[in-house]
Amino acid sequence: MAANFWESSHCTEWLLDRNKIEESNPKDKQYLTPIELKKLRTHYCFVIQNLGNALKLRQRAISTAIVYFKRFYLKNSFVDCEPRLVAVTCLYLSSKVEECITQAKKCAAKMKEIDHSFNYLMNDILECEFFVLEELDFCLIIYHPYKSLPFYLQSSGLDPASIEIIWGIVNDSYRTDVCLLYPPFVVGLGCILLGSYLLKKDIKQWLSELNVEMKDIWEVSKDLIDYYEFEKQQSLQNQSELDLLYNKLPIRNKK
């Protein structure tokens, strides 16, 4: 494990450019429009979040699982690798990495409660885990904004109510691609910038004293605004509509 972010595989191997992300899910694009594919990608972030909540896992483990899922589908497509199974497997794997271990059998049973059409069992998850590990190149340590955020929030002078909203924005950020594009401290600052704007809090002086590159921080805020607009316009949790999109894909080995 690297002693700090800048020496880690997260920094040296898994910070990507937008073109790399846009090239992902190539086979799925034969069956879904870009908007439909974006809806499904976002939906599985909700799936992981909801399953993690049901299993009472820490938010950090849930966020790590979402990053695993996003990284996995940079190399793979939904049609080749069943996304519900991969989502559950990523969460099971992250629970071990983040030291809040749950059982594969429990993951399968709880997912079945959430999605009655989920027919995968413990052995399917354990088998899938080896494939996920290979596709992640065994790079399992994920750095999150959660570590640097308390320091920035304390020094910003924002009130407790504003801070709580910003924590929510950070969790929402995992439904975007900013975790693949920017270092975690940049993501955290982008969330603070957006939160202060929405709450009409002036933090310009504080930001100027941080001596950080503002371009990427603005980009993170813009990506989050785009996501919230997308969420307003699309039925991201309309299960019947999402089922229709899922069924448009000729997924191999679907149970």
Swiss-Prot record:
Residues 46-134 form the Cyclin N-terminal domain. Coiled coil: none annotated. It comes from the Eukaryota. It is found in: Nucleus. SUPFAM superfamilies: Cyclin-like. Keywords: Activator, Cyclin, Nucleus, Repressor, Transcription, Transcription regulation. Gene3D superfamilies: Cyclin-like. GO terms for cellular component: mediator complex; nucleus. Transmembrane segments: none annotated. GO terms for biological process: positive regulation of transcription by RNA polymerase II; regulation of aggregation involved in sorocarp development; regulation of DNA-templated transcription. GO terms for molecular function: cyclin-dependent protein serine/threonine kinase regulator activity. PANTHER family: CYCLIN. Component of the Mediator complex, a coactivator involved in regulated gene transcription of nearly all RNA polymerase II-dependent genes. Mediator functions as a bridge to convey information from gene-specific regulatory proteins to the basal RNA polymerase II transcription machinery. Mediator is recruited to promoters by direct interactions with regulatory proteins and serves as a scaffold for the assembly of a functional preinitiation complex with RNA polymerase II and the general transcription factors. Component of the Mediator complex. Belongs to the cyclin family. Cyclin C subfamily. This is Cyclin-C. It comes from Dictyostelium discoideum. The lineage of its organism: Eukaryota, Amoebozoa, Evosea, Eumycetozoa, Dictyostelia. The gene is cycC.
